[in-house]
Regions:
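Post-Walker A helix-loop "phosphate-sensing" segment adjacent to the P-loop in P-loop NTPases
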Residues: 162
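Cationic, low-complexity basic patches in intrinsically disordered or flexible, solvent-exposed regions
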Residues: 4, 13, 26
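Conserved acyl-donor/pantetheine-binding loop and adjacent beta-alpha core of acyl/acetyltransferases
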Residues: 96-135, 153, 166-176
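Conserved acetyl-CoA-binding loop-helix of GNAT-fold acetyltransferases
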Residues: 144-159
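Short amphipathic alpha-helix that is part of the acyltransferase structural core
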Residues: 23-100, 104-106
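Active-site acidic-Proline motif in GNAT/NAT acetyltransferases
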Residues: 139-141
C-alpha cells in the first residue's frame, strides 16, 4: 500500500512523500483490536491536546519530559516535514519528531542536549546531511502492533526525498 503525505509550505505546492507500507506486516494482536483505520500523517498544532494525553501515558513514571506546546510549534515552524503522528481510528497513538543536523556538528560523540540545542532546536540546519530523530513513541495500549514501523518507513522515505546521508536517533532517559 502506497500512502502520500503532503506538507504545505508558504504558498508553494509543498513537499510530498510517498511511503510504501506494503512490507509492514500485522500480527494477531492487531487483528483482535478491531481497528478500522490507521493513518500516518503530518502533525498539526491542533493535535497538541491529544498528543499531550499520549505523552502523559507514555511517560507515566512521573517524569516531566513532555514536549511543550511551544516546542511543538517551533518544530512545526522550522521543519514541518519532520513531525508526524500515527492515528488509529481518529486517536493519536504515536508520534515521531525530527530535525536535520550536519554530521560534522554532532559526529558520534554528542549528548541529546547538544544535538537539540537544549530542546530549543536551534541546531536544526535545513542544509544539514543527517535526519536526526529526537522522539518516537507509541501509546502503551497500542504497542506490539508494529505501528512505529510506519513512522520509521516515513523517515526513511523523507531522508531519501531530501537527499540526506543517513538517519540518527537520540532519546531522553527520564530520571537519568
Amino acid at each position: 500500500m502506497k500512502e502520500r503525505l503532503t506538507f504545505p509550505s508558504d504558498g508553494e505546492q509543498g513537499l510530498e512523500i510517498s511511503c510504501n507500507f506494503a512490507g509492514v506486516k500485522y500480527d494477531e494482536q492487531m487483528e483482535n483490536q478491531s481497528i478500522t483505520k490507521i493513518q500516518v500523517r503530518p502533525l498539526q498544532i491542533e493535535d497538541y491536546g491529544q498528543l499531550a494525553q499520549s505523552f502523559r501515558r507514555v511517560y507515566s513514571d512521573g517524569s516531566d519530559v513532555f514536549w511543550t506546546h511551544e516546542q511543538i510549534e517551533t518544530l512545526l515552524r522550522i521543519f514541518p516535514e519532520g513531525q508526524i503522528v500515527t492515528v488509529v481510528d481518529e486517536k493519536i497513538v504515536g508520534c515521531a519528531l525530527s530535525i536535520i543536523v550536519n554530521y560534522d556538528d554532532v559526529k558520534n560523540d554528542h549528548t541529546y542536549a547538544q544535538v537539540t540545542g537544549k530542546e530549543t532546536f536551534n541546531t536544526h540546519n535545513p542544509k544539514g546531511n543527517i535526519l536526526y530523530g529526537i522522539e518516537v513513541f507509541i501509546h502503551p495500549d497500542y504497542r506490539g502492533l508494529r505501528l512505529a514501523r510506519r513512522m520509521y518507513e516515513y523517515r526513511k522515505d523523507l531522508c531519501e526525498k531530501l537527499n540526506l546521508k543517513s538517519i540518527m536517533f537520540g532519546g531522553r532517559i527520564p530520571h537519568y
